[in-house]
Amino acid sequence: MTMSKEAVTFKDVAVVFTEEELGLLDLAQRKLYRDVMLENFRNLLSVGHQPFHRDTFHFLREEKFWMMDIATQREGNSGGKIQPEMKTFPEAGPHEGWSCQQIWEEIASDLTRPQDSTIKSSQFFEQGDAHSQVEEGLSIMHTGQKPSNCGKCKQSFSDMSIFDLPQQIRSAEKSHSCDECGKSFCYISALHIHQRVHLGEKLFKCDVCGKEFSQSLHLQTHQRVHTGEKPFKCEQCGRGFRCRSALTVHCKLHMGEKHYNCEACGRAFIHDFQLQKHQRIHTGEKPFKCEICSVSFRLRSSLNRHCVVHTGKKPNSTGEYGKGFIRRLDLCKHQTIHTGEKPYNCKECGKSFRRSSYLLIHQRVHTGEKPYKCDKCGKSYITKSGLDLHHRAHTGERPYNCDDCGKSFRQASSILNHKRLHCRKKPFKCEDCGKKLVYRSYRKDQQKNHSGENPSKCEDCGKRYKRRLNLDIILSLFLNDT
């Protein structure tokens, strides 16, 4: 039987390190590498593509890591790159000039252990008659004999030691559990890497910003923030992402399916983690706690923003005025003050606003919506700040005090206007007569004097007043007399 030209060998799927690269891996990562290589090796055996399986299998099981022999290097033809010498051997049948001994010697010369610069095929033969085991594996390949059969998938295997692997894959067995959080893993080496999260070990540091990570994969993903690399592209909209998981989450947006429903309010979500975050609103759970002031938050991102308050760092600042902000979003909002940009327009009256939240509040003027209601008197307000200010009328709270005369006020704007009396500041000017005034409302009254307008009318006597306040005073006096 002639071997297929498309036959996959262990070298085709193996991840081979140089000695320098292997030195960058810690013990847990080496074990994980060994486990993955071992599984790839077993999978190849299950389809009968690898004849010299036993010794490679034993060396992987003994955690003796392999790497490409770079002792002999040659100058590459393109770009002058140094490339490791790679030996290839023809895909020939057993009667075309390549014996089992020759194949084994070629493999032994191509792969070497980290502590040896070269390795001889005789070193393999000394360990438990490995050559006879190779010949046994090759003879099985020649004859096609596969004595072990799986009862579930009817797949045949040439080695009983490999027979259990497909069953393990089908059952997705995760026998190694974390004592801290209960998360399970297929490999104990993967568990060891996971446990760094609980131990706080962060062995991998970014050279650009100094941020540390518990896994090298997380560092590689983070470095794309600095390089701008987004290798994972959405086929529908072309949007790029730094990590595959973000692309997977994004693709569900195109599907539009919302399978996760909140039992409390009925709101639907695309992802289960979005539902979990939302449910904290109903349960009041705040699992993320500040270690400095013990304030708790529903989201980790909220905690991260809060922690910057303690450090005093404001990494986002305006180049013109130097004002700093904790979040870049706040910086972008602030910059609209300098640019004068007001991109949000009201369709009813055409008024423009810098922020979408301002537009939403303004639209309540047209709709008449007043969602904030006082529990004591039933009066409603458009904004929450308006309701909070109204509450002070019931409580009598006046938190803003004048340092000059001691007079108290319910709101900050009132004390600012009051202080102009002490400093004799009159920032408002009548456009008709040029008279300077303390308050903006006084300027409006002055303009009414020039125009003769008296908009406030008493319904009982018909008398008109320039200011609504004057009418209210007259009415209160009349009611007291009666």
From Swiss-Prot:
Chief location bin: nucleus
Cellular location(s): Nucleus
PROSITE patterns documented for this protein: KRAB, ZINC_FINGER_C2H2_1, ZINC_FINGER_C2H2_2
Pfam families found in the cross-reference section: KRAB, zf-C2H2
Annotated keywords: DNA-binding, Metal-binding, Nucleus, Repeat, Transcription, Transcription regulation, Zinc, Zinc-finger
Domain KRAB: 8-78
GO cellular component terms listed in the entry, alphabetical order: nucleus
Residue stretches in coiled coil: none
Record-level Gene Ontology MF annotations: DNA binding; DNA-binding transcription factor activity; zinc ion binding
Domain of life of the native organism: Eukaryota
Keyword Transit peptide attributed: no
Zinc finger (C2H2-type) in chain: 176-198, 204-226, 232-254, 260-282, 288-310, 316-338, 344-366, 372-394, 400-422, 428-450
Keyword Repeat part of the UniProt annotation: yes
Family the UniProt entry places it in: Belongs to the krueppel C2H2-type zinc-finger protein family.
Role noted for this protein: May be involved in transcriptional regulation.
Name of the molecule in the record: Zinc finger protein 223
Record lineage: Eukaryota, Metazoa, Chordata, Craniata, Vertebrata
